[in-house]
Amino acid sequence: MLRDSTMRRTWKFWALCLAASSIVTVCADSDKSVTAAQVNGTWKTKHSEFKIWALGQLRLQIEFSGVYEYKTPQGPSANEGEGSGVATIEGDTAIFKPEGAEEECRITLKFTGAKLVVTQTGICGFGHNVSAAGTYKKVSDMKPKFESN
């Protein structure tokens, strides 16, 4: 009888530990989620801009435009690039491949409070030295006007 009692307490202890770890995991995942209000709007750096609007079902409409400025003997010059499409978002991170971009193009957008941290891998076809990578600041919460609409 004593052995059964000890065994039941041991099982209850492990069940409680398992339940507690599940709760912590769920809470940790939910802390990373962002709302539509947090992602919607216009985000800018000195030379680049993202327009973002939540479409629902973990999808975002995205439009990027960027500029790479450089000097030439004739004076200042610039390369411009843009891309648009639909991204998928999970938690606080969206993955975006602009329509018509090379297959290896991958743009990752991580929403961290008032900042948007963007990384780019692969060739995305924006133009020589034009990149989406950088840390963006939100400049508007309003629904952006998308060129594709």
Positions of PLM-derived features:
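Bacterial N-terminal signal peptides that target proteins for export
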Residues: 4-15
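Bacterial N-terminal signal peptides
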Residues: 15-22
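C-terminal motif of bacterial Sec signal peptides marking the signal peptidase cleavage site
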Residues: 25-26
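Central antiparallel beta-sheet cores of small beta-barrel/beta-sandwich binding domains
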Residues: 31-106, 137, 141
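Beta-strand-rich cores of mature extracytoplasmic or soluble domains
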Residues: 104, 113-128
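C-terminal partner/receptor-binding element of secreted or periplasmic proteins
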Residues: 124-149
